[in-house]
Structures are given as structure tokens and as C-alpha cells.
Amino acid sequence: MGKTLFENIWDEHVIYEREDGDVLLYIDRHMTHDLHFRSFAAFKENGLTLREPDKTFGVPDHSVPTTAKTIDDIPEGEMRTAVEVLAEAAEEMGFTHYSMTDDRHGIVHVVGPEQGITLPGLTLVCGDSHTSTHGALGCISFGIGSTEVQHVMATQTVWQRKPKMMRINITGKLGFGVSGKDVILAVIREISAAGGTGYAIEFAGPVIEAMSMEGRMTVCNMAIEAGARSGIIAPDEKTIEYCKGRPYSPTGTEWDK
């Protein structure tokens, strides 16, 4: 029996499998944000070291008011502390940090694709349920908890159990003014807000193929609203064209591979 896209990527990243079915999974990319500031403090208190600084990327977005341009614009309090701690952790540990004054700054799940951090065939995690957004580029992506954030930082791995597989094939064509958001809401209406519980959903079919990359990201983002662990879309020429030339995308012979 053949494997799904998700299963192929998963199996390539399994380091060890326990008798209970849980596996130690290698993580290619770790996105983090300001609400992990307590994880950074605990990480430091436990005397741990960031294993692979070049594979962690920090983006302050959860506590940043839309009107704030710099940290000084955020009122004193926990929100400001969260942003400050992320910046301090990045400087101390040496991981990439897209600060509020960086032109590349934005929402963590948008920065990843825009910068080429998110690429087909990778595993990517972040301490946020909507990490599934990145699956639109053909990678395995899922949210993790605060303790798991520390585990990934220390080992570049995480313990997980492989989800069940579900494929949703969407036929027909998008009508005028109909977006990816409408499509995924229609899917959730059909399968319910718990219909994807325990599954990784692969979205496919002509409607998905016709969507922009941003539309695909919206669909995968909201797989969580169907209860799914993750969403994924097989990469195609549109995906490759989107990734081409971005800062962290391969170049030269590496791109040709």
C-alpha cells in the first residue's frame, strides 16, 4: 500500500519509535514568538543550551498592538515583557529574530513562508495551534506546547504520535468572490468542528490547485477549526515558483535538487 505525502515526510524524520507508537521526530524548523517568554526563562533556569540556533526563528506577534511600532510603544506590563524577553533570548542564544523594527516583521505564520523558512518536505513546529498554515507549502507543520518548545530547543526533536490520514478532494471551480476561507468553512460545515480530530488532512483537487498560495495557507490554517492536528497540500509548480528566490530557499545546485 502506498504512502501519503504526510507519511513519506514523517517517516523520513523518525529517529526512534517506542513500543507504544510514539516517535522521536526530527524538526527542521522551529518558529517561536513572544508568548513563549516563560519557556525561555525555564530553559535558562534549567541550564539548557539551544542545540541548533540556525533552525529557530523568533517573531514577536501575539502581544504586539497594531498601533505599536517599537517596544517603547507597548505599555509597561506582561505584553511588553514578553516582547523584551524574546529579543533577549534571541541575542543570548543566537537565533534569528524578526524584531518589531525589522522590515521583515509580521505574523509568525506569514514570516515563515515569506522568508523561505517554510519549504516542501520539511518538519516545522511552533507553539501555536495554527502552525498548520505552513502545510500549504507541502511540509508537516503542527503546534506544540510550552514544554515541547523547550524540548525542541534543547534537542531539535519532539515526541509525537503519528496522526491518522484524511484526504479531502475538492472538485469544481471557485465562483466569483469565493476564497479559501469560504472553502474551508464549507468543509468544516460538512465534517463538523470535530470531524478532523486525530487526523492530518491532505487537501487536494482542482479547487485547491487553482488557489493562490495565500488561499492554500488559509485552508491549512483552519484545518485546526475542523479539529485536525495538521493540514497539508502537495507542492506543485505554483508552490515551487512561490518558494523560488526567497532568503532561506536553496540556490544553485541545491535548488536544482
Where are these regions (language model features)?
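Fe-S-dependent hydro-lyases/dehydratases of central metabolism
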Residues: 1-257
